């Protein structure tokens, strides 16, 4: 059971500002949002922040290719990202950018602190340089033969076939992906963060028991291999923050990106007067700090980032919540197969609630990959949300409206069943709190099945035919509406927009603390369709639009 402080700062990994969000990105934002919404519902003071990762060579080159400035491009992308996230009902308190005054000041301040503490080293390195474009080539802008397995077409940092990691200069027959020419080797003096100094601090943090077992085991592998000094500088031309008193040198994006968490929170504090910055980032902070991230960036967040914080005399994360990748119909996302689906393309064809629910049925606290199978997606959403939950309200509301002027009865027909549903809040709440979202959904759907069995056995459509059993009909259907209310209370973190519609129908707020008291002698609103069924033709249209 995760013990959560009363004050919490939650972040998602920063989307890179050179392209659109896709359904892979949305997994993390939805997972974090469900957890954040649950914590808020249970009375925690939560601040949920994110930002665009807006620096680096890829952004500089793409902007140049598009004939615009990097600033213009990242501003456009930022607006697009914020629109997509809002339509997916992601409840950020602040969504910002790493290209900000707050972040620049923080990066320079942290760098100066590290430098004063003797943690910044200088040394000469050899780099690959494109003589056509006059640019030092980042790892992902050079390809060649893997130095270990000798297979071709591998990037400059690691082999996707054998898993080897290496320096770009180790590639056999390297070629620039920009010009296709063989790059030349050029020397340059770079700045390095003395990461090995923090080996024991990081080992202790890893052994604290807070991290997922798979994550802790992976970090132990890195410790066993030995930590290396970290190159935190890049040569001009580069889009980012220039290193003070070092002309032509810029901070590497992976230094200023995680500091962007602090920058985004600082910006939120500047916009409000009710948040004390030091309560969340000071070394003595009693607040919790959680980073939701994908498993591909565990090294940066589990090794590099806490070391930077330790060296800067700032607090370390309480925990990293790491998730796996999204596959589509069992395979990696692919542009050619039409499965690298943009968030905006999805939203043009389908309601955000569908994906929020489907991801929730798959999410757990481990780092296994999650498959978005479209046949299962359609069947699961229709069976669970439409058939079991919404139809429960629709069937009973029709009788309440027709015979009882939309007013619920004065008594609960089955108090034992109602209490059983309320008692389930303990286990369901524990599952949400521990990020075992799929378990929470399973338990909620077991309740939904039981509610529908209750209605099926009571047969209100038969009872309605006998005018002498009007009170029974009233009690049965009022019970059905009350069970719907409890189901929607539990689903509120997963389906916030549907929950708002349910509140309008029920004419009351959904509240975990007050649900022990049923709705009796209570006027509800006329029932309106809350959500439509999905069809495979809608999914096909979405995929066709992706090609």
Swiss-Prot record:
Cofactor binding note of this UniProt entry: Binds 1 zinc ion per subunit.
GO molecular function, one term: methionine-tRNA ligase activity
Keyword Metal-binding: yes
Motif ('KMSKS' region): 332-336
GO biological process, one term: methionyl-tRNA aminoacylation
Alphabetic keyword roster: Aminoacyl-tRNA synthetase, ATP-binding, Cytoplasm, Ligase, Metal-binding, Nucleotide-binding, Protein biosynthesis, Zinc
The protein's assembly and partners: Monomer.
Protein's recorded name: Methionine--tRNA ligase
Taxonomic placement: Bacteria, Pseudomonadati, Pseudomonadota, Gammaproteobacteria, Candidatus Palibaumannia
């Amino acid at each position: 059971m995760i013990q959560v402080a009363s004050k919490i700062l939650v972040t998602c990994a920063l989307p890179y500002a050179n392209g659109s969000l896709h359904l892979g990105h949305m997994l993390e934002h939805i997972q974090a949002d469900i957890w954040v919404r649950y914590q808020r519902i249970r009375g925690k003071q939560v601040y949920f922040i994110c930002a665009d990762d807006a620096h680096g060579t890829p952004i500089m080159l793409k902007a140049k290719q598009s004939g615009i400035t990097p600033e213009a491009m990242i501003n456009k992308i930022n607006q697009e990202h914020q629109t997509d996230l809002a339509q997916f009902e992601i409840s950020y308190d602040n969504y910002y950018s790493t290209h900000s005054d707050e972040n620049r000041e923080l990066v320079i301040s942290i760098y100066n602190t590290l430098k004063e503490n003797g943690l910044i080293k200088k040394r000469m390195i050899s780099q690959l340089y494109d003589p056509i474009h006059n640019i030092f080539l980042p790892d992902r802008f050079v390809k060649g033969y893997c130095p270990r397995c000798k297979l071709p077409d591998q990037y400059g940092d690691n082999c996707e076939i054998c898993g080897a990691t290496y320096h770009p200069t180790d590639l056999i027959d390297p070629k620039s992906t920009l010009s296709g020419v063989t790059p030349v080797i050029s020397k340059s003096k770079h700045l390095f963060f003395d990461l090995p100094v923090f080996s024991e601090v990081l080992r202790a943090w890893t052994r604290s028991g807070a991290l997922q077992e798979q994550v802790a085991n992976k970090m132990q592998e890195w410790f066993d291999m030995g930590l290396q000094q970290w190159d935190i500088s890049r040569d001009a031309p580069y889009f980012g923050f220039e290193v003070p008193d070092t002309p032509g040198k810029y901070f590497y994006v992976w230094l200023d990106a995680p500091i962007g968490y602090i920058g985004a929170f600082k910006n939120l504090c500047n916009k409000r007067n009710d948040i004390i910055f030091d309560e969340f980032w000071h070394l003595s902070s009693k607040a919790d700090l959680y980073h939701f991230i994908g498993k591909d960036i565990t090294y940066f967040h589990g090794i590099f980032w806490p070391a930077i914080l330790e060296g800067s005399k700032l607090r370390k994360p309480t925990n990293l919540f790491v998730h796996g990748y999204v596959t589509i119909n069992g395979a990696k996302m692919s542009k050619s197969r039409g499965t690298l689906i943009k968030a905006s393309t999805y939203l043009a064809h389908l309601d955000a609630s569908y994906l929020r629910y489907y991801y929730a049925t798959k999410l757990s606290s481990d780092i296994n990959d999650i498959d978005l199978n479209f046949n299962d997606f359609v069947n699961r959403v229709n069976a669970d949300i439409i058939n079991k939950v919404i139809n429960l309200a629709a069937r009973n509301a029709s009788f309440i409206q027709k015979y009882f002027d939309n007013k619920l009865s004065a008594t609960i027909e089955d108090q034992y069943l109602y209490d059983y549903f309320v008692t389930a809040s303990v286990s369901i709440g524990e599952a949400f709190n521990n990020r075992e979202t799929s378990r929470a959904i399973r338990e909620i759907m077991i309740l939904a099945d039981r509610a529908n069995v209750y209605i099926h056995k009571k047969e209100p459509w038969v009872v309605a035919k006998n005018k002498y059993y009007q009170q029974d009909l009233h009690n049965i259907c009022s019970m059905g509406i009350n069970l719907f209310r409890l189901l929607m209370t539990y689903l509120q973190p997963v389906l916030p927009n549907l929950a708002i519609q349910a509140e309008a129908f029920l004419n009351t707020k959904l509240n975990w603390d007050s649900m022990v008291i049923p709705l009796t002698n209570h006027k509800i609103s006329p029932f309106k369709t809350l959500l439509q069924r999905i069809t495979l033709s809608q999914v096909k249209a979405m995929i066709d639009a992706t090609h």
